[in-house]
C-alpha cells in the first residue's frame, strides 16, 4: 500500500512513518519542516518538503505517486499559543484540511486518517469521555480540530472521501529503541519538560496551576504512548479500507494522572529528585481529560502495550538521555 504521511517529520508523524515502513508499505512524507525534523524521517520513506496548503503540490504528489491513503498530522497543536494567536490556527489547520481534501478529490484518493484531539470535548460534564460526549471546545486549537472533523464529514457526503478521526488524549513517550522522540522548540509538554529538567538539573521546571478541580489541584490527563497510538492509526486505516466507512475513535488508556503524579513517576523512573515551582494556570486548559477507549479496543482490536505511565515515561527517558539536545538540526 502507498501511504502519504503529511506532517511525517513531526513527533507523532515520524513514528507513523517508521511503523508503516516496518510493515512493508511504500511510504511518502510531505512536511514543510516548520516544526518537524528531517532527521526524524525514516530513510526508507520518500521525502517531499512542502506545505499542505499548496493544493497543486499535494494533488500532484497524490496523482504521480498513485497514493492509496493519507495520514494527516500537519496541524499546529499548542493550546496556549492558539489562545494568543487564534487566526494562525484557523488559517493553518482549517485551511490546510480544505486544501488537502480538494487535492484528494482531484486525485481520486478516498481514504484519510486524521490526527484529531480530545481538545474537541472541552470541559466534559462526566468522565471518562466517550465518542458520544458532546463536542464543546474551549480553545481555538480544539475548535479547529472540531471544524476539521466536520469538514471531513461533509466531504465524505459530497465526494465519498472516507475518514477516520482519532481523538488523541495526551501523547507521550518515544520509540522503544530510543532513536526517535519528542523535540519541540519551545517545548510545552509536561513529560519532556520534566525530563529535560532532570538532565539539566537547573531546577526550572514549572507546573502551571494548582487550583483545578482535581484531587491535588493540578491538571489530570490520560497519557497514551506514541507507539501504541500509531498502532491504532494503522489498525484504523485497515479497518476503514475494509469497511469503506468513516468513523471516530478515542485513543487513551482510561487512566488519569495529575501533573504532580507524573512528576513523582518521573522521579521514580529517572532516579533523580526533580525540583519544581508552581506557576499560574495556562489559558484554555480543562481540569481533567480521561478517555473511554472501549470503542477502539473493541472495533479495531487495539491493545496498548504501555498502560502504566511509568512505562510511558521510561521510553521518553531513553530518548532524552541519548538525545539531550534533540535532533540538533534547527
UniProtKB/Swiss-Prot annotation:
Kindly give the CDD domains that the UniProt entry links to this protein.
UDP_G4E_1_SDR_e (cd05247)
The UniProt record gives the binding positions of substrate as: 117, 141, 170, 189-190, 206-208, 221, 282-285
Record: active site: 141
Coiled-coil regions listed: none
Q: Which Pfam families match?
A: Epimerase
- Outline the inducing conditions: Seems to be constitutively expressed.
Q: What pathway annotation does it carry? A: Carbohydrate metabolism; galactose metabolism
MF terms (GO), sorted A to Z? UDP-glucose 4-epimerase activity
Q: Which keywords fit this entry according to its UniProt record?
A: Carbohydrate metabolism, Galactose metabolism, Isomerase, NAD
InterPro entries in the record: Epimerase_deHydtase (IPR001509), NAD(P)-bd_dom_sf (IPR036291), UDP_G4E (IPR005886)
Instruction: List its EC numbers.
Output: 5.1.3.2
Q: Which reaction(s) does its UniProt entry say it catalyses?
A: UDP-alpha-D-glucose = UDP-alpha-D-galactose
Query: What SUPFAM superfamilies is this protein classified in?
Result: NAD(P)-binding Rossmann-fold domains
Which cofactor does this sequence's record say it needs? NAD(+)
Which family is it part of? Answer: Belongs to the NAD(P)-dependent epimerase/dehydratase family.
- What job does this protein perform? Involved in the metabolism of galactose. Catalyzes the conversion of UDP-galactose (UDP-Gal) to UDP-glucose (UDP-Glc) through a mechanism involving the transient reduction of NAD. It also could be involved in preparation of carbohydrate residues for incorporation into complex polymers, such as exopolysaccharides.
- This chain's protein is named UDP-glucose 4-epimerase
Lineage, opening ranks: Bacteria, Bacillati, Bacillota, Bacilli, Lactobacillales
Amino acid at each position: 500500500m502507498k501511504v502519504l504521511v503529511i506532517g511525517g517529520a513531526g513527533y507523532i508523524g515520524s513514528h507513523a512513518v517508521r511503523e508503516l515502513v516496518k510493515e512493508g508499505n511504500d511510504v511518502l512524507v510531505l512536511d514543510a519542516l516548520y516544526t518537524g525534523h528531517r532527521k526524524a524521517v525514516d530513510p526508507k520513506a520518500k521525502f517531499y518538503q512542502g506545505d499542505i496548503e499548496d493544493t497543486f503540490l499535494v494533488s500532484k504528489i497524490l496523482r504521480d505517486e498513485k497514493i492509496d491513503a493519507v495520514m494527516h498530522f500537519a496541524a499546529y497543536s499548542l493550546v496556549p499559543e492558539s489562545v494568543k494567536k487564534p487566526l494562525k490556527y484557523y488559517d493553518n489547520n482549517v485551511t490546510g484540511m480544505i486544501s488537502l481534501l480538494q487535492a484528494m478529490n482531484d486525485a481520486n484518493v478516498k481514504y484519510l486518517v486524521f490526527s484529531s484531539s480530545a481538545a474537541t470535548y472541552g470541559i466534559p460534564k462526566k468522565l471518562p469521555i466517550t465518542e458520544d460526549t458532546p463536542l464543546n471546545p474551549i480553545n481555538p486549537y480544539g475548535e479547529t480540530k472540531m471544524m476539521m472533523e466536520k469538514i471531513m464529514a461533509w466531504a465524505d457526503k459530497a465526494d465519498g472521501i472516507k475518514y477516520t478521526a482519532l481523538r488523541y488524549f495526551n501523547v507521550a513517550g518515544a520509540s522503544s529503541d530510543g532513536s526517535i522522540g519528542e523535540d519541540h522548540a519551545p517545548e510545552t509538554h509536561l513529560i519532556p519538560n520534566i525530563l529535560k529538567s532532570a538532565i539539566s538539573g537547573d531546577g526550572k521546571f514549572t507546573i502551571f496551576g494548582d487550583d483545578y478541580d482535581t484531587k491535588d489541584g493540578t491538571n489530570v490527563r490520560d497519557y497514551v504512548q506514541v507507539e501504541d497510538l500509531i498502532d491504532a492509526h494503522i489498525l484504523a486505516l485497515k479497518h476503514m479500507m475494509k469497511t469503506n466507512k468513516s468513523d471516530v475513535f478515542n485513543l487513551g488508556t482510561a487512566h488519569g494522572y495529575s501533573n504532580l503524579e507524573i512528576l513523582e513517576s518521573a522521579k521514580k523512573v529517572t532516579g533523580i529528585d526533580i525540583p519544581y515551582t508552581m506557576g499560574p494556570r495556562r489559558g484554555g486548559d480543562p481540569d481533567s481529560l480521561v478517555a473511554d477507549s472501549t470503542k477502539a479496543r473493541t472495533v479495531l482490536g487495539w491493545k496498548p502495550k504501555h498502560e502504566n505511565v511509568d512505562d510511558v515515561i521510561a521510553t521518553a527517558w531513553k530518548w532524552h538521555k541519548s538525545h539531550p539536545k534533540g535532533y540538533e538540526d534547527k
